[in-house]
Amino acid sequence: MSSIFSSVLFAVNREDHLVECQVIEQHKPERMLAIGSGGCIALTLKTIYPDLHLTVFDINPYQLSHINKKIKALRSSNYDALNISNKNDSCLNQSGKFDKMFQDLRKSFINNISGEYELNKFFDVETTSNQRRIIQTN
């Protein structure tokens, strides 16, 4: 039986950084421990709080290696490797085992439940709550 930690599981985090930011704003820590996962939260926190000493931990060594690849891509301005401003299903932000599952779920949703236009419109920041209700009822 192979180990679940034999490859990158999550290429990106699907949570936001707001909880951590609230803790930092309220308690003003000098140091913080963060779970590595896809590295999105840790990289965001270092961007917002560059003086914060952030230690990143993950039980899966492949996740930490993945984060280091993201750091190298950012330092060298290799945004294509991160899938910024282009669509590349094999980039760093799409390389986890579970990311493929999320891509397949999205495709299935678009093909069987709602079209791509409706999905994009629903999640567009410019879409109002009323417009979202209309999309949901169609």
Question: Where are the regions a protein language model picked out?
Answer:
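Class I SAM-dependent methyltransferase Rossmann-like catalytic core
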Residues: 1-27
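Phosphate/oxyanion-binding active-site loops and adjacent basic polyanion-contact surfaces
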Residues: 9, 34, 63
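Intrinsically disordered, low-complexity coil segments
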Residues: 25-28, 49-52
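Conserved class I S-adenosyl-L-methionine
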Residues: 28-40, 55
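Conserved SAM-binding loop of SAM-dependent methyltransferases across substrates and taxa
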Residues: 38-50
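Conserved acidic E/D residue at the C-terminus of a beta-strand in Rossmann-like folds
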Residues: 56-61
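Class I S-adenosyl-L-methionine-dependent methyltransferase module
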Residues: 62-138
